[in-house]
């Protein structure tokens, strides 16, 4: 991996740009004006004048730097103002190698799109003054619970290997209907769902397709309970808490696997039906929680378990 010559600033990495090998642009600045001059020409000139755009080894570029002098350049993006999300991260464990936190619903794991400062990673880098912090896995923005991050670049690889080799056991909880939706067969629990999932970057939803299974989840029904209005005795008012053990880590895997049984997770705006985009409703978080994570710590060689202190808002009993 190519090392950025610019440090993390305000918890955010510098952006890397590859310059074209050739083209009608004389200088690196000409090329950047071609790409982004319609948005903020003054800002681009100011950055070159201030020496804020650098090449490999941290060499500063100026307005006259030739296009062919550099293959890669780095700079800090102008960050749009963000509204702080009304959710908090709980720190559960911190040592010289790892940080374990409870990520709240609605907060993305890593910066992207409209969420930069408002991501678990950037918030924690700034809060703890840990510019080298990197998450070892991801949770969907709408999912809450246990998130493991590496605080130490020297030992990071040893934890990464555990995730790559699937030597980390993860346990989730969700709240769904107690019985499958109309048209779906009854389910004998525990059940293992196996299928082939795919997710294209251009499309919001993950899809199940024919072929060799690449996604597997063991699902257990923990307990059923009455939901909502106690005077409403229709079957739909019965819900259940489920324990999920994913053996693979596909995007949206747990949400898709529950929906495939006719047991879509409560407050899921994507599965089984994609709802119209709406502002976040903080009173209705997706009822999916990363409850626990277990592995043999590569440093101490001891089996460790970290468990979430959060509870799903719709779980009863």
Which residues fall in each region the model found?
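RNA pseudouridine synthases
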Residues: 1-317
């Amino acid at each position: 991996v190519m090392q950025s010559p610019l440090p993390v600033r305000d918890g955010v990495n510098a952006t890397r740009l590859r310059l074209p090998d050739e083209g009608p642009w004389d200088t690196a600045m000409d090329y950047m004006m071609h790409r982004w001059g319609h948005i903020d020409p003054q800002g681009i000139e100011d950055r070159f004048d201030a020496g804020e755009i650098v090449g490999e080894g941290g060499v500063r570029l100026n307005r006259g730097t030739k296009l062919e002098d550099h293959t890669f350049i780095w700079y800090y993006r102008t960050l749009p103002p963000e509204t702080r999300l009304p959710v908090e991260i709980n720190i559960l464990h911190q040592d010289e190698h790892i940080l374990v936190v409870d990520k709240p619903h609605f907060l993305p794991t890593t910066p992207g799109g409209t969420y930069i400062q408002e991501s678990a990673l950037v918030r924690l880098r700034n809060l703890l003054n840990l510019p080298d912090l990197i998450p070892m896995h991801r949770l969907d923005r709408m999912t809450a619970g246990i998130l493991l991050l590496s605080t130490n670049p020297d030992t990071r690889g040893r934890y990464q290997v555990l995730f790559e080799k699937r030597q980390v056991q993860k346990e989730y909880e969700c709240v769904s209907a107690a019985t499958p939706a109309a048209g779906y067969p009854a389910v004998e629990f525990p059940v293992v769902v196996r299928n082939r999932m795919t997710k294209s970057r251009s499309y919001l939803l993950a899809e199940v397709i024919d072929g060799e299974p690449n996604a597997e989840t063991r699902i257990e029904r923990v307990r059923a309970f009455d939901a909502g209005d106690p005077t409403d005795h229709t079957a739909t008012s019965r819900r259940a808490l489920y324990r999920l053990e994913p053996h693979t880590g596909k995007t949206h895997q747990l949400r898709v696997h529950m929906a495939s049984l006719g047991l879509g997770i409560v407050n899921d705006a994507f599965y089984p039906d994609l709802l119209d985009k709406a502002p976040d409703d903080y009173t209705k978080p997706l009822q999916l929680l990363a409850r626990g994570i277990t592995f043999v710590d590569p440093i101490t060689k001891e089996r460790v378990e970290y468990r979430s202190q959060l509870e799903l808002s719709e779980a009863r009993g």
